[in-house]
Structure formats: structure tokens, C-alpha cells
Amino acid sequence: MKLSYLWRGLPGHPLHPPLTDATIGIYTFATLAGLVEVVGLTNRNGAIGWWLGLVFGLVATVPTALAGLADWLTITWGSELWWTATWHLLAMVSATVFFGLAAIFGHTAYTHANVSAGAYALTVIGFGLMTLGGWLGGAIVYVHGMRVLSLVDEPTERAVAPVPHPEKEMAEGS
């Protein structure tokens, strides 16, 4: 077992993608909770869910970003994959900045069980940037094929096994 498996995941089972699912889900919840408060569908619960969602999203961003950075550092500098991954990184960091600003500038309104228009606008901008970053992340995997092993004839029990096999390590180049 290699130490790098702790921050990069196993061959064929990278760590960054499942972490992004959780992080994107949390920020999506925060954006929707803020929306229901802004349009008046809730009287205070939307504001509480919005702000707590932003905070939990920011916490979840840390391991997600670190796992992504670990993958980014393995890419050949200046390659087309590197450019796509770098734009993905910039979009996601920008989204995080906007979500962070929304949490900071929206805290006072949150303490009064409200969502301010400015803080919610920052949330929506963050959500838009996150969506762009997700699109670019999809290109990294589905167009460039990063960390895709393409072992199409791998038996199911070996494909899903949480133990790295030599074929997987060789296919990933590790």
C-alpha cells in the first residue's frame, strides 16, 4: 500500500471526485435554501440552512481542494490536460472565494434569520463559478481521461475491489 493513496485514492478510485460530489451537493443545498428564503417561501429556516450550508461547504472544500491539488501536481506542466485542469482549479477557487464572502457578509443577516440580497448574489455567483468548474472537471475525466484506467475486461470483483491490483497500478502509471 502506497502512502499517496491517502491523498490521491486508489488506482481507478481517485479521492477527489467523490469529495466533489459532497461539496457540490452542500453548496447546491445552500444556494437553494437561500433561494427559498429570498423568495419568501420560508420565514427563517431557509436563512439558517443557507448560512450553515455555506459554512459546511467551506469545510468540505478543504479536503476536496487538497485532493484535487494532489492530482493537479501530477499533470505534465503546459499540456492541454494541464490547461483544462488549471482553468478548473481557478474556477473552483473563485467559487470558494464567493461562497466565503457570502458567508462573511451574510453572517449578520443570518443572525437575524434573514438572507441579505448582496450575500445571496455572492452565493449565486459562487454557484455559477462552481458549475463552470464542474463542467471543466468533467472535461478532465471524460475528454482527457485523467485517472481513467480503461480496463474494460476487468472482472467485476476486481474492478470494485478496494485493494489495488498490479494491473490497476500499471494502467494508472503508478
Protein language model features and the residues they cover:
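Polytopic transmembrane helical bundles with strong interfacial aromatic enrichment
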Residues: 1-73, 77-174
